[in-house]
């Protein structure tokens, strides 16, 4: 199911000279959010805040120790977040932990029927230089995701950071696979989450 956004306007005020937006958003899993605002932008920002309180993001290294064990740890983390009200999960679609996490969400859809997978890509064709096996896994999660968000129209190093910023700004929790030392996109995202004071569940070496 695709998310559906509808709205209409009415005239308000003593002289009927003010416009009020009556806004309704139905998410991919059927959850409904309604609000009113003076502009459509105000309504959408209010919706995004509501969604962020129901959302978690993933970040992690491309090299993963014991992929099968890590996948089970991710599933446990998803179930834990689900029990605490999380329904939307954002993944970046990169090789390694991102792919494992996205596949874990998809594998739990029969068990947790209202969870939503949103893939956030830095630019179109980020899989261009993936190895064939990784490309196949990427296209599988890309095609099965409930939504795909593209943050930039073309390749740039900044696009990767914009992707990470987008996920953090739309989430209230972070599920990470971070060794605590390495620099790069995972470290950047964890530090952004720390700055925002988000709960972080680090699955590296069985930590949750």
Indicate where each model-derived feature is located.
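Short N-terminal "domain-start" leader segments
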Residues: 1-22
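Intrinsically disordered, low-complexity regulatory regions of eukaryotic regulatory proteins
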Residues: 3, 15-16, 32, 46, ...
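Short, solvent-exposed loop/turn segments that connect beta-strands within catalytic domains
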Residues: 15-19, 30, 112-114
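A short, exposed loop/beta-hairpin motif centered on an aromatic-Gly-Thr core
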Residues: 28-42
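Mixed-charge, Lys/Arg-enriched low-complexity segments
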Residues: 38-52
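Acidic/glycine-enriched connector segments
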Residues: 52-208
């Amino acid at each position: 199911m695709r998310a559906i956004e509808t709205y209409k306007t009415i005239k308000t005020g003593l002289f009927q000279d003010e416009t009020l937006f009556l806004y309704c958003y139905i998410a991919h899993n059927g959850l409904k959010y309604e609000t009113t605002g003076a502009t459509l932008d105000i309504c959408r920002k209010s919706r995004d805040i509501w969604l962020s309180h129901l959302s978690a993001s993933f970040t992690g290294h491309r090299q993963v120790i014991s992929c099968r064990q890590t996948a089970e740890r991710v599933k446990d983390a998803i179930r834990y977040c689900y029990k605490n009200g999380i329904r939307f999960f954002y993944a970046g679609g990169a090789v390694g932990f991102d792919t494992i996490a996205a596949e874990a969400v998809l594998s739990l859809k029969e068990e947790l029927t209202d969870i939503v997978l949103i893939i956030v890509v830095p630019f179109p064709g980020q899989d261009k230089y993936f190895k064939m096996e990784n490309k196949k896994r990427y296209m599988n999660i890309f095609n099965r995701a409930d939504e795909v968000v593209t943050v930039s129209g073309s390749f740039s190093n900044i696009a990767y950071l914009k992707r990470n910023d987008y996920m953090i700004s739309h989430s209230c929790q972070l599920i990470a696979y971070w060794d605590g030392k390495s620099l790069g996109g995972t470290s950047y995202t964890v530090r952004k989450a720390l700055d925002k004071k988000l709960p972080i569940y680090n699955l590296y070496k069985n930590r949750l």
